[in-house]
């Protein structure tokens, strides 16, 4: 004889909950990865059936506490990282694990709400960035490959904007490889260390490395002076406007087959050419290199 459910219930376990929560039933049944606690203990492991003192979803405890109490082993290192971090990602600071992780089931590892690359997940909150990316012709490699976490910590870190490594946001900065540590996780350091090159960069006048000339000095220009970070409307993510204090100054950059030219607002245009070095540039570069030598002393 089939026993009736206790307490006058019409059903038991997840079947009882799914009588109303049909959308969650579909998520669980159609997903590749099922949260272990849902599989082993069902809904009441995390939810009260009648009432709750928490802020939403009749949770037995507040969201962060609920997750950490079960995932103690996995979150031990993470909680230490968060506790010592100078910058905490907003969903983490607010205890919203479910902002990025599906609490019931998911088609992606670690129960992420989107994947396998993290751009769709990040763009679910960062909608302005999503629109800017959509409208841009040239996307930075990590954006193009859908890997925000190549540069950003998803939970917490010690650099503003949740960046993994240091990134200087000023226009001028004394040359130090550490200042560019984020960029040089992908880009070669030699691009700012070699005075001359025929292959490291196309930004050169003959074989004179103009990256070195701009960056490797006491009053060096930072990456941000010329390049957009995420995407841009010009090749190599060259800016149309460069931030300078409270101003934004037009660069007026034009690319040619063998070089380019720019004129920063009030300044006369400057040109460079890889095949036919511009003489005026050579003379000016020599003077600047002398300045660099003096600064080094």
Residue ranges and their predicted role:
Residues 1-297:
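Short sequence/structural segments immediately N-terminal
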